């Protein structure tokens, strides 16, 4: 929320291409959330490969979008400060993925004991 408030305060706008990229990342985060919830509901949880895969997909998407971002900044496809806010949002979404895998790992650990 703070990142978007600062973006708006500085009058920066994400164009459609940036929003599409962020939506792609948010879709993966949503899938990771769904996996985490399913893992939490599973009383016999021993395998969290679904969560590992979800986290991997989030990380790979972030890596790919970050590489695209660098090229877009080099080509002046959008304002530098807009790009900073975009990367900040991507990083926050990736952190959510980290938190979700940690929760699945804790749920698995709980069921192993």
Residue ranges and their predicted role:
Residues 1-113:
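Cytosolic, long alpha-helical scaffolding segments
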